[in-house]
Amino acid sequence: MKIEEYLETLPENLLSGEDVQLTEKSFREIFKFVDLGEPDIFYHLGCGNEKGIEIAINEFKVKKAVGIDNNPKKIQLAKEVLEERNIPGQLICENIEESDISDASIILFWFTDDSVINQMLGKFENLKPETKIITIWGPLPDCIPDKVNFPYIINKIPLKKAQSMQEQLLSIFGVKCVDFVTAWEFAERYTKSIGTPEIRNDRFLTIIQTLIIWINAKKLGVACGEEIPESIQTYIKLMKMNFDIDFEYLLKEESV
């Protein structure tokens, strides 16, 4: 099967972030990285549950914390938890595209749906200067991040536009070109950072992410060297022979 077909079989579409709940550890890492604190008004878009709001209020003492999600069951359950624990967070059930986030100082935004991202981009561009938007894995489309602690990325208003996809990619990885070691390092950071109970084989997912990172870099012309590294070739063969997961066609597309 093609790699895209395999990704669709993963629990909660794990690799893309769709409907995945961040761990408490991840929230704390993100909040420390973005320097969340008492003056801040924090929004978690697509919150899914109350956990990020609870930690923002109880541990980081934010001025205000709001979670928004369009799943009524999840929002209702999250509200009940906050009420039971007497935590003054706000939880709103609506589509984030329709939400008023104009007072935000820090926003957590982890979506992969292009239509949602593109609609929100216009909304973000109208936010007040210095507002921080945290994304995971990559920055906002066509933008250069303000700060990176991979896989966590801070985008700051006003957004800085990238001159090219290559410039954007290199701003994330901090290297002039992406080799196997770089791809593996960042894939491992991602897998460990978003670790959930569904991840039973970190190494397996790290291999998949490594191949995705390197092949994307190759397509963008920022992979180190012209030849495919031996390690990449080995893992591509391993995926095909042992798991019937095909990456080779992606390289063929690149060479056309």
Q: For each predicted feature, which ranges?
A:
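Charged, amphipathic alpha-helical linkers/stalks
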Residues: 156-206
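Conserved SAM-binding strand-loop segment of SAM-dependent methyltransferases
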Residues: 85-96
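C-terminal substrate-binding/active-site "lid" region of AdoMet-derived donor-dependent transferases
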Residues: 115-173
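Conserved SAM-binding loop of SAM-dependent methyltransferases across substrates and taxa
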Residues: 51-62
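Conserved SAM/SAH-binding beta-strand->alpha-helix loop
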Residues: 71
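Conserved SAM-binding loop
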Residues: 78-79
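S-adenosyl-L-methionine
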Residues: 1-37
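Conserved class I S-adenosyl-L-methionine
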Residues: 39-48
